[in-house]
Amino acid sequence: MPKRVVPEEARRRRRPTRQGVVLSETLIVQAALRMLREHGSAGLTARRLGAALGADPSTLYRYFAGMDDLARAIGDELMGRALDRWTATGDWRADLRTLGLALHSSYLAHPQAAVLAASRVSGRPREIAVDETILGILRGAGLPDPAAVRFYQAFIDLALAFAALDAGELALSAEARTRDEEMWDSTYARLPATTHPNIATTARLLAARMLHSAYPVVLDTLLDGIAAELAAAGARATD
């Protein structure tokens, strides 16, 4: 006689933990985000997470297939938080810009989590909602599907790549980050014009600029490219 398949919800813990809370995916992800902030990715283990939640570590596997599955859920949560803060206006450029900045900001709010999750594809509902939204904006702007997919990839990869890059800097110790930032004054600004004329000429500008993320600038460049493609398509249509 075949074994009865137990529904997923029935496998999950309904009794309160030692901390007096009833576990859920959301609660576990929130605890994981706190743990990443305090201990970094090396400190995120099932044992430590279980202890923080007042539950046996094995209980976590009722909710997630493993720590890799949890990492995907963390990325999904960060995606969802960005979408929750975003409001559509109907202007494709404004909507893409604010959504891109919201995604970047959501990941930077949790640098250790961003380093862990920015490169992952979760396939979870909130990530899917973000992807559907981006494609909807691009197609709604008038791009044909091949161009919409091309710019979708450029848009989401740009947001996540800069999220990972900028989060990596924020995840450094304060001492290491300060040393890196001071390098523009302590080293670059002192290079002689005889050997490094271009750096010497722009050293002060570099020192001021390199303390900021390039993401907004590059995002605007991408949006300019989308606008140019839409304009070219419109011109061809009127010929």
Predicted regions: what is each one?
Residues 54-64:
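Short hydrophobic/aromatic patch on the recognition helix
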Residues 84-126, 145-148, 152-155:
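Hydrophobic alpha-helical connector segments
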Residues 130-185, 207-208, 226-230:
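Hydrophobic alpha-helical bundle segments that form small-molecule/ligand-binding pockets
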